[in-house]
Structure formats: C-alpha cells, structure tokens
Amino acid sequence: MKYYSTNKQAPDATLEEAVVKGLAADKGLFMPFAIKPLPQDFYDSIDTLGFQEIAYRVADAFFGEDVPADTLKQIVYDTLSFDVPLVKVTENIYSLELFHGPTLAFKDVGGRFMARLLGYFIRKEGKKQVNVLVATSGDTGSAVANGFLGVEGIHVYVLYPKGKVSEIQEKQFTTLGQNITALEVDGTFDDCQALVKAAFMDKELNEHMQLTSANSINVARFLPQAFYYFYAYAQLKRAGKAGDAVICVPSGNFGNITAGLFGKRMGLPVKRFIASNNRNDIFYQYLQTGVYAPRPSIATIANAMDVGDPSNFARVLDLYGGSHAAISAEISGATYPDGQIAETMKEVWKDNHYLLDPHGACGFRALQEGLQAGETGIFLETAHPAKFKDTVEKIIGEAVQIPEKLQAFMRGEKKSLPMSKGFEDFKRYLMSI
C-alpha cells in the first residue's frame, strides 16, 4: 500500500520508505492511501479470538500487501507477548490496562512493533545502520529504547528534557547501554521534538547518516496502537456490554486516539471518542472554537500529556478532510487541571479501590462526567501508577508497590550525555559519529 503526506507536497511512499524515513520530505506525516473495513464476520466472532489473533487481522489490513504473512504474524505475536486486560472499575466504566508490557506503558505496543518491522526492512535491504531519533516526555523513550534494545543494525538516540522526567522513567532508558544513547536536553519536550524534526530536514546530516524517527509521527509506531481498541471491544462484547461503547483517550501527541479513529474507520463499533487533556488543552480549545492554536506546553502531574503542539493533529485533520464539524461529531473533549486530576485519583482509590495514574485519571473523569444513559465507557490506562510513584503516593497517602520489572531498572546506573537545545550542538554531535 502507498502512503501519502498530510501536506500533499511530497511523492507517495511505500510502507518501507514511510517507516525508514519517518517524516515526509515536505515535513508532513504519512497516511495510508486506504483504510480497509474489516468484514462483518470478524466483528461477529471477535469475542472468540485472542489478542494476538485480533491484532494480526488488523495488521494484515494495513501491512499485508507489503510484509509476507508469516513475517507479519511473527512480528505481531512477538510484539504482543503480554495481555491488555479490560478491568471493571464502576458499573459502566472499564479500564483498558495498557501497562503490562516490559516498560509498563501503552507505548510498548508501538515501540516493539516498530523495532521488529524496521529490523525486518533493514535485513531485507542489507542496510548497514539506521539511526533512530526519538524525543520523549517520559514513556516513549523507555518503550522505544527497550523495544529496539539489541536489534542489529539500529542505534537509538533518546532526547529527553532535563529534570522533567520522573526518575523511574529516566532509568528505563539511561541504564541500557548497548545500542541506546540517552541525550539529556536543557529544555522542554517541545524543544526535544524540534531538534528531532530539524535533524530530519538537514540535508548534510541526512547525507552523513540514515535517520528515522520512532515518535508517533512514524506509521509503524502509531498504527499498531489500533490493535488494542479491537481487543477492548472483544472483551466488552464478552461481558455483554458492547452496545453503546464510548472510548476516552488521555491525549498528548494524539497518536493514540488517531489509532482508535482508524479502528472506527475499519468498522470498529465505537459510538464516539473523548479526548481528555490536562491543562495543555489545545485540542479541546480547537473543538470549542474551530481554531488550532498551538502554544508552549505547561508542566502538569500528567507529564506525558504536556504537549503544546500535538504532531498527530495533522492526521486527525486529514482523516476528516479538514472539517471541524466532522471532527466534533465523533470526538468530544475534556480538560482538567492538576487539582481535579488528583481529586479523581483519590476518590477512585477510596471508593473503588482502583489505583489510577494521573493520565488514566483524566480519562476516567471525562467518562464519569460525560457518559450518557445506556453507554459503556472504556478509558485507556496508559501507564502503571508506580511510574509516577511520588505523585501517586502524595495524593492517596499510601505507599505504592513497585513491580519487579521497574525495580530492575532502578538498580541500573544512569548514563546520559548533556545537550543544549540549540540545533547546531546536536548536529555537531551527530556529525561526529
């Protein structure tokens, strides 16, 4: 299948080109030419299928023309070596727990899939080395770094904002070594993202080394996130609650909700979506006004959503032909300051004995306030609460158990290189490699 750029000024690309390049030549994001609806019999029997089988059927619709069936199946089955259970929190609100992978965050799905797909293309082409640049506000760095760890022919550079990532998150990508290098940038997440984008646009740098991105701008990162929306629906169907399903997605860079919207286009029976923001509510403001006005990000306790200019908004706009009315018809918004996020975490722990992380709390609250009669809500619980241990403990007034997977990272020694937010320094560093 061919991929086109959201800016419509670049040549169409094959899947391999889209994955290896990451960003189109005109700075646009790649979109598949077609989103194929899955047959009705798939939805009729979806509740009898396991996660890996469902994911393979979805992956085949996107990637089947470009990747041999046995290879694609192996990539999907290797990626999803963990469960994504749907857990009942209240009578009509369920949590889709996306934190059972190696780094306890939803990004394990996209990170692991992309690492395996890129590895396949590199082997196929006999390429020597591909360099992956990834900007992170926390979970992306750990998921991508761990997904790519030890993959031959790939070196990963993780750029993260100094002092703005929790210690647990930082340890997950600064202690790995091997083919992973952590760069500690004296700036914000938006500065890190700007450095990555500038690197792709620099001709001299791209002649010096093969670069690609592992942020959700890469189709191999964001499309696999559609897998768990289908699996969530399958589990809801098993529970006899699949009627009017509403999915709420805590949203930062908007890759996650975009994957869900792709699922809806493939026929997934979701009534509507809610995009839940923290104070960085650029999308919420767009829904209210019809004007997209990016602004510098503000630090909040839901730090993975501290994004002032969400990259994937371009994909949402493209999907709906630029129509504000069409977007508003399928997606509503919610926005919460830290006080309300904390209050929700405290109440849900007290009333339901369910521990939310700050991002999941935004999702739960939007459903609690926005579900209509007869609807069933699913919110995406995107990371394990222990990844935000200090914040969560302060809010609920109790100790949070750290899973063994995280404890193992905490025992590692941090190794990172300091970097200014100026592109010339970053370029000089990469040119010296």
PLM segments and residue spans:
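PLP-dependent amino-acid enzyme catalytic core
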Residues: M1-I433
